[in-house]
Amino acid sequence: MLVTMKKKSERTLRNRLLQVGMVMAAAVILFASMGLPAQAGKKRRAQTAATPLTYGDAYIIKFDGNGATGGVMDDMVLPTGLAYPLETNRYTRTGYSFAGWADASGNVYNNNQIVQNLKNGRIESRKLAVFSAGFPINQALKFRSTQGSVVFDRNGHRYLAFTASINDPSYYAGDLSHYETAVLLYDLTTGQLVADVHNLNFDHGNSMCYNPDNGHIYIAEGGSLPGYPSGIMELTWDLKAIDSHGFPDLGRAFSITYANGQYFVIGKGPRDGDATTLFRLNSDMQMEDHFNVSKWYPAGYSPQGIAADDHFVYCIAANFSHHQWKKSQKVVVFTRNGLYAGTWSLDITKEAEDMSILGNDVYITTNDKTATTLYQSVLPSVKLYAQWVPAR
């Protein structure tokens, strides 16, 4: 059902989102870099030796302290079909001794036990609704593209914000006489449009994120053509523009996300031929580090939107050499330190534009030209709970 400025959202068809995991050589490199144990009998190898290997659908193992009073555990990413030891327990609990792990089904695992196929890696994505971009101020025209989006929680409500623009041939020829942008904000709790703003000075608005610490929305402006805005635009949560951020090393900002006090931006430097780079910024939008990630994008793929959680950055990539989106879209996954973790395939038949992660909920929006479709999914993961016995 199309959601307009007056109609409510409605759950409709289901769509399957498949993830095809690709890991570094022997899956040792990533885990070693995160402090995880190397495979038994093998030494840890340098990151420079990494070569992506296709094993099938990947899944995440999450470790829950289950009452622990100390210690921190990293997530693991494993492809189906690969046997690999669980990370050494680093949780502690006062007055108790660690007795292994258990999953929600009651299966029990020893410390460092070699496991395989704890999850099939496949997640189902359901289509929530189609949200209208409305009309340009000049209603004789139509929006030609919906781009970046973000789903966020505020004051007990869940919202969707997304951008729209008239990027027609005149726009690409440098004629802005009728070019128009829009940002729309829908309340997913009620299905109602609650705010919209037209003609903010951004180019495309490729990607968006929300910072819950200050309540602001950020737009990666895009910079598709010389002279067009190419940095980061900052808005209040209700779409009032308040600032714009530029960076000497960042010529074109394609994607942005925020998680746990850090922003992550996919972009390129100011010079032609600069590599696709993952930039990490602190909470004050100051550059902390950057990582050349171009070699991890399949040939011909371009950056779309991104999302992040406690451990990983998830980057949508699309191949625009043809529009068979079901075959030409990927999610490239990196650690927060820029190390390659894997590549998943998207089984969505429309152009996937942006991605948001809220806890276990994953949201993906697509470009429907005059609207955007919102899908909801869950990352393929299994949670292992620490088991404790009273200390003797």
What spans do the regions from the language model cover?
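Short coil/turn segments that connect the beta-strands within blades of beta-propeller domains
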Residues: G156-Y159, D213-G215, N260-Q262, D310-F312, ...
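Repeated scaffold domains used in trafficking and secretory/extracellular systems
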Residues: K142-F152, F202-C209, F247-N260, P298-A307, ...
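Loop/turn-rich, solvent-exposed surfaces of beta-rich toroidal or solenoidal domains
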Residues: Y297-F334
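Beta-strand-rich domains and repeat architectures in extracellular enzymes and scaffolds
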Residues: P136-G174
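Structural motif
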Residues: S170-V183, L225-E234, D272-L281, H322-V332, ...
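Secondary-structure capping and domain/repeat boundary segments
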Residues: G41-Q116, N120
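Blade-loop segments of beta-propeller domains
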Residues: T181-L184, T190-N214, E221
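A short beta-strand motif characteristic of beta-propeller blades
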Residues: R126-L141, Q192-H198, K240-F247, M287-Y297, ...
